[in-house]
A protein has these predicted regions:
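Substrate-recognition/cap regions that form aromatic- and gly/pro-loop-enriched pockets
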Residues: 1-109
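Activity-critical C-terminal alpha-helical subdomain
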Residues: 93-138
């Protein structure tokens, strides 16, 4: 029962790829932030990646790190911190865990412009859309 672990408000997940050469530095920043905020992630997963995908593929060289946070009074600060981190270091976010994705984050994917162009060709009349596609303007 998720309510038992996270309460009725639930949780949110943040997941992104950190390039190998920035991993230690960014991990220290995250640790310092969480300590300062006196908050913690109930679940953390770190995986090694070394492949390159196509378009908006989440893989890349480095480590993916995923955090689950209970939605509480710290939500805004946590969301702002991770969004700033993604922007500052041009991190690639897992689009299926898209809470912190916005239009500017999408440009961290070198193939985003090509993907956007192909989507507009396939969906020129904008008959198919979602909150996600509206947020990314695709």
């Amino acid at each position: 029962d998720w309510n038992r672990a996270y309460g009725k408000k639930g949780f949110f997940q943040i997941q992104f790829i950190i390039p190998e050469n920035k991993f230690k530095k960014i991990l220290i920043k995250i640790s310092d932030f969480l300590r300062k905020e006196k908050t913690f992630s109930t679940f953390i997963v770190i995986k090694r990646h070394n492949e390159k995908g196509k378009y908006l593929n989440y893989s890349g060289n480095g480590y993916s790190i995923s955090f689950d946070f209970k939605i509480n009074k710290n939500f805004s600060n946590i969301n702002f911190f991770f969004n700033s981190l993604v922007k500052k270091y041009s991190l690639r976010v897992n689009f299926s865990k898209d809470l912190i994705i916005n239009r500017s984050n999408a440009y961290n994917y070198p193939e985003f412009k090509i993907f956007k162009k192909e989507i507009s060709l396939l969906n020129s009349k904008k008959k198919i859309n979602s909150f996600f596609s509206k947020r990314l303007n695709i």
